């Protein structure tokens, strides 16, 4: 097989040229970072689990007609995705106070919010992904008003669906981060959900104990990060085919 050309390497994933025009291969790494790279480490098997969890959730979203960049999983660490023009915004959906929201507003962590809150952050590691308003987004033309309407609608629909899915398996969806991209089909432009949905970009707490089951375990040096990710996969019924045995998985098939 011809070696694929690497196009981009981020903190948790690598993008390679896809087998067909308009496609990419997304490879999930075991690398973990926090504080925009200020803290880094390796969580063995994280890439394998995130690949499976994200595949499962993206396919479920497809079933309710939420468009995503996901096409299919290729192997334990890679999935085929549609190439999109990424909108330079992180869209954070919050149901329960935690993380930066608790710090900024002095709301005790774990307080259920009176309504779902959507926040926007400008994707720029050098600036620390600053929080921005819709006024900033419009002024700097990061996204058109129609793009924002589409992203907000998709974010809220995704939230409603995922909240129900996680509640059914005893997990509280505290908050999560989404990224979106544009794709052109002839003259028509559509907004798709991109990136991933996994314990790397969702805050997930056990519904009974509030035990953290996400990357906060790494951020806060709580330990048992791998076990937490495995527990999420187990509750969703999607551990790797080999079970817990080989979470390292193969290297990228290039």
Curated annotation (Swiss-Prot):
Catalytic activity from the UniProt record: 5-amino-1-(5-phospho-D-ribosyl)imidazole-4-carboxylate + L-aspartate + ATP = (2S)-2-[5-amino-1-(5-phospho-beta-D-ribosyl)imidazole-4-carboxamido]succinate + ADP + phosphate + 2 H(+)
Pathway entry: Purine metabolism; IMP biosynthesis via de novo pathway; 5-amino-1-(5-phospho-D-ribosyl)imidazole-4-carboxamide from 5-amino-1-(5-phospho-D-ribosyl)imidazole-4-carboxylate: step 1/2
One Gene Ontology cellular component annotation held by this UniProt entry: cytosol
Gene name of this polypeptide: purC
Protein's organism: Gluconobacter oxydans (strain 621H) (Gluconobacter suboxydans)
Pfam families cross-referenced by the UniProt entry: SAICAR_synt
Name this polypeptide is given: Phosphoribosylaminoimidazole-succinocarboxamide synthase
GO biological process, alphabetically ordered: 'de novo' IMP biosynthetic process; cobalamin biosynthetic process
Family of the protein in this entry: Belongs to the SAICAR synthetase family.
E.C. numbers: 6.3.2.6
Alphabetized NCBIfam families for the sequence: purC
Keyword Nucleotide-binding part of the UniProt annotation: yes
GO terms, molecular function: ATP binding; phosphoribosylaminoimidazolesuccinocarboxamide synthase activity
UniProt keyword annotations, A-Z: ATP-binding, Ligase, Nucleotide-binding, Purine biosynthesis
């Amino acid at each position: 097989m011809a070696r694929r050309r690497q196009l981009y390497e981020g903190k948790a994933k690598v993008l390679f040229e896809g087998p067909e025009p308009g496609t990419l291969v997304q490879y999930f790494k075991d690398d973990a970072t926090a504080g925009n790279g200020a803290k880094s480490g390796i969580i063995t098997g994280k890439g394998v689990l995130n690949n499976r969890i994200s595949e499962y959730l993206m396919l479920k979203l497809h079933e309710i007609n939420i468009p995503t960049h996901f096409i299919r999983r290729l192997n334990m660490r890679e999935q085929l995705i549609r190439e999109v023009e990424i909108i330079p915004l992180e869209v954070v959906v919050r149901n329960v106070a935690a993380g930066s929201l608790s710090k900024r507003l002095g709301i005790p962590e774990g307080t259920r919010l009176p309504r779902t809150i959507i926040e926007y952050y400008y994707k720029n590691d050098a600036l620390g992904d600053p929080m921005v308003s819709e006024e900033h987004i419009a002024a700097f033309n990061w996204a058109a008003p129609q793009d924002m309407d589409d992203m907000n609608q998709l974010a809220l629909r995704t939230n409603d669906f995922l909240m129900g899915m996680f509640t059914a398996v005893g997990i509280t969806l505290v908050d999560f981060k989404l990224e979106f991209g544009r794709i052109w089909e002839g003259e028509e432009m559509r907004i798709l959900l991109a990136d991933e949905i996994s314990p790397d970009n969702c805050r997930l707490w056990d519904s009974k104990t509030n035990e953290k089951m996400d990357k906060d375990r790494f951020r806060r040096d709580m330990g048992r990060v791998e076990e937490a990710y495995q527990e999420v996969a187990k509750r969703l019924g999607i551990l790797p085919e080999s079970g817990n045995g080989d979470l390292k998985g193969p290297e990228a098939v290039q």
